[in-house]
Every structure is written in C-alpha cells, then in structure tokens.
Amino acid sequence: FLDDKFDEYFIKGLFFRKMKQYERAEANYREALKIRHNSLTAKNGLAISLQRQDKYNREALNLARFTYNQQPTNPYFIVTYFKSLIRTNPDQTIILNQLIKDLRSSWDINKESFGDMLQAEYVFFIEHDFNRAISIYKDTLRKNPLYPVFISLHEICSIYQKRCGIGSGIASEIAKRYHFDVDNDDSF
C-alpha cells in the first residue's frame, strides 16, 4: 500500500512539475519522501521544483548534493546540483568545473549539448560574460536544438533583464527560430 501511495505522490509531483505548477509539485514530492525517505528521483524532483520557484536555497542545494553524491554519473543529478551550486555558492569553481566534466563524460546521448549548457551558465554566473554565454547557447542550439538548453538560456536572459534592463528579446528571437514554446516546459 505504501509503495502505491509513493508512486501516486511521485507521479503527481512529476505531472505538476511538467505543468509548471511547482508549489503543487513540491507538496507531492514532499509527501512521496515521507513514504520513501531516500528516493533519489523524488529528492531530485523536489530540488528541481524548488529551483523553478526561484528557491535556490540551502534545502535545494542539499537535496541536489545528496542525489549527486549517491549517483555522481547520473546526468540529471549533475545538472540539478550544478544549477543549485552555481546560484548559491559560486565560489566553488573547482566543483563546478568538475560537474561540467562529469556531465560531458556521462552516458547521456546529449551530454555535449548539456555540458555546453552548463558551460554557458558558468560563463554567465562566474565570468560575468553575458554575450559569450549567449554565443555558447546559440552555437549549442544550432547543433542540437534541445528544449532544456533553451530553458537555461531563457533563465539567464531573465536574470540579465532584471539586472541590466536588457536581454529579453534574445530568448524570444531564439524561441521563434526553433519553435520553442516557453509555456511547454519539457526540461529536466
């Protein structure tokens, strides 16, 4: 019975995350984790749900770090950990670079594109070079137009827009070029 309830909460968490109802996703992942405390996929789903609510906090970081430490070759866990770490502890450049390297050597068929995505975030957050980050995103999308890469670019453009008042048109232009629908979030 408990496994059935875990599955129910986990699937609802995934469903609500895909529907961009992140608070509901968070609540369902939390319920799933009450039943199966060490479920790596539920912990990762909860970390992503927190991130999507712009809650790049200690909880999201600890969840992401835990899942990564349990399965350091899992590309999904690498991405989640990287995204939390770079936003909360950007001084951890050795770890951040290792995560990019780990992702590029993972089993994922899109490891190069996702590695480039993390590299673009690194260039933006650590090197503070928006234009170079955008150039990396554009090159990556030209080779392999993956929606998660676009979502990452969209997030960076939104942050840059808030900081500097410019940059929002770039994501819109790329969305049109590759027929991406920002409302249809199909990323990690």
Task: Give, region by region, the residue ranges found by the protein language model.
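Residue-level recognition of tetratricopeptide repeat
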Residues: K5, L14, S39, I48, N74, K83, E112-S113, E121-Y122, ...
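TPR alpha-solenoid repeat register
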Residues: E8, A42, F77, G115-D116, ...
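Position-specific recognition of the canonical hydrophobic site in helix A of tetratricopeptide repeat
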Residues: L14-R17, Q51-R52, I86, F124-F125
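Residue-level detector of the short coil/turn that links helix A to helix B
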Residues: K20, D54-K55, N89, E127-H128, ...
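Single-residue signature of alpha-solenoid repeat helices
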Residues: A25, A60, L96-L99, A133
